[in-house]
C-alpha cells in the first residue's frame, strides 16, 4: 500500500482505557504496520507503552487533558470539553494529520464531535452507525445502530445508500440486497416510517428487496438492513444478550452431564470456530457513515483484539475510499446535487 494512512485512537475512551487501547494499537501496528497516534494523557500513555517492545512500530502520542465519560452529554462533549481525547482525535482528522479515528468511548459524543468538526457529506442529513452482524452465509450491515432514535423516511433511504456502498466495497457484496426492517414482508405491514421509506427505496437504483423481518438479519438473505436507531439499538442489545445467554446455558448443560463433557471435547474446534464467528471483537467496531472522514465506534467494553481489528477496519475504509464512493452513489441517487457540491464533499 503506497498511501500512508494514519489512524488516531481515542486512548481514554472505553471501560478499560487506556490499557486496552494501547495493547490493541501495539498489536495493529505490529501486525499491519499501521501508523497510529494515541490521543490522551501523555503520562498515563507513556507508562502503559513502556511495557511493550516498540521497536519498528510507528506509534506517537498526542496529549489531551480531558476525557468524555460515558455519562457526559454529546453537547457537553462538543461545547465544554474542548481538549478531550475524542475532540483532539477528530481535530487531527479535520486537519488531515490522521485519516481515521477509532474510539470505544461515548458513542453519542463521538458522533456529535465527528459531525461538528468534520461536517456531513453533502446529501446526507443524518450520519449513521453501521453495525456488522454475522449471518449464516457471511455478514449483514445493520443501520442505524443507535445514532438516530427518531428518523424520517428519507433518512432510512439514505441509510440504505450508505449501507449498500459499505457492503459492496468492504464486505465484497457485488450488488448488495437492501431491506427495510419491518414486522412482516407484505407491503401492508410496518409502521408509517417503514412504509414511506419502502416507497422511497423502491424508486432508488439500489438492489432493494422490500420489507425484511428480524430473523432475516441472520439468514444471509439480505445484505443491508435499515431501520431507525431506536429499533436498531434494541436489535443489537437483544442479539448480544441472546448470544451470551445461549453460551451460558450451553456451558451449564455441558457441566452437568458426563457424556456432554466428552462430546464437547470432540466438538471443541467447532465451538471455537462458532465463538469466533459471533464474537464482536472479530468485527472491531461500527463505522460512523456520513461524515467527511472515517470514524470507527467500538463497544465500550472492547478488548484489545476488538481495538486492533477496529484500527484495521478503519485503515481499510480509507484505503477503499468509502466516502468518495458514497459521494458518487449519492450523485446517482440525487442528480440535483451539483458537481461543485459533490467535489467539495470529496475534498
Swiss-Prot record:
A GO CC annotation given for this chain: cytoplasm
UniProt keyword Lipid metabolism present: yes
Keywords assigned by UniProt, alphabetized: Cytoplasm, Lipid biosynthesis, Lipid metabolism, Phospholipid biosynthesis, Phospholipid metabolism, Transferase
Pathways involved: Lipid metabolism; phospholipid metabolism
InterPro entries: FA_synthesis, Phospholipid_synth_PlsX-like
UniProt superkingdom: Bacteria
MF GO annotations: phosphate:acyl-[acyl carrier protein] acyltransferase activity
Reactions that this protein is recorded to catalyse: a fatty acyl-[ACP] + phosphate = an acyl phosphate + holo-[ACP]
One GO term (biological process): fatty acid biosynthetic process
EC number(s) on file: 2.3.1.274
Compartment(s): Cytoplasm
Keyword Lyase: no
Function of the protein: Catalyzes the reversible formation of acyl-phosphate (acyl-PO(4)) from acyl-[acyl-carrier-protein] (acyl-ACP). This enzyme utilizes acyl-ACP as fatty acyl donor, but not acyl-CoA.
Family: Belongs to the PlsX family.
PANTHER family referenced in this protein's UniProt entry, alphabetically: FATTY ACID/PHOSPHOLIPID SYNTHESIS PROTEIN PLSX, PHOSPHATE ACYLTRANSFERASE
Subunit record text: Homodimer. Probably interacts with PlsY.
Protein name: Phosphate acyltransferase
Organism annotation: Syntrophotalea carbinolica (strain DSM 2380 / NBRC 103641 / GraBd1)
Taxonomic path: Bacteria, Pseudomonadati, Thermodesulfobacteriota, Desulfuromonadia, Desulfuromonadales
